[in-house]
Amino acid sequence: EREIRAFIPVTYFVIAGEFKTVGRMRESKTYPIILECEVQPNKKEEAERIVREGKNSSWEIVGVDSTEVSRSPKAPFTTSTLQQAASSRLGYAPSRTMGIAQKLYEKGLITYMRTDSTNLGAEAIAEISSVIEKNYGKDMLQVRQYKTKSKNAQEAHEAVRPTHPTSRSAGTTDDEKRLYSLIWERTVSSQMKDALLKRSKVTANIP
């Protein structure tokens, strides 16, 4: 409590810029990079000076540090995660998502869309494994079981998934096809190995 009362808020400015670099292989092509200034001035005048100097100068990359990181696939969809993904990826409101999912379910293309479970049945996992081996290679397969976070979820129920994972595309309307594709991708990727990503830190200065 004493530390909270003694805390004095400090104003500072975060400065970032978008830079374009000339590709080595194709001189005509540029690649945008977002860089953040290490200095965070607490005065507006100083921040404006840095921005002004940065805009009117040529920059030189002085260092690139790269590290490999792994990222695990996300669990198969529950009702809530399907709504969230459809909102961010497709721009669908929750009610629109559920309406489309209802039609896909009625056509026998996906499992029941109201579920808190991330569980996949043994038969579904076998089909998904076959799809991965055939299309991406056996090395990309990693069978996973996801533990449902909801205490009230019934593990006997399955996650929202394609009823026939071998079908990459399904649905009649564009909305149905887009949502089905989203569900298919999430379901199949849930049984794949971790993605290996390269994270790079670029340091640039004004020479």
Summary of predicted features, one role per range:
Residues 1-207:
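Core catalytic DNA strand-manipulation module of type IA topoisomerases
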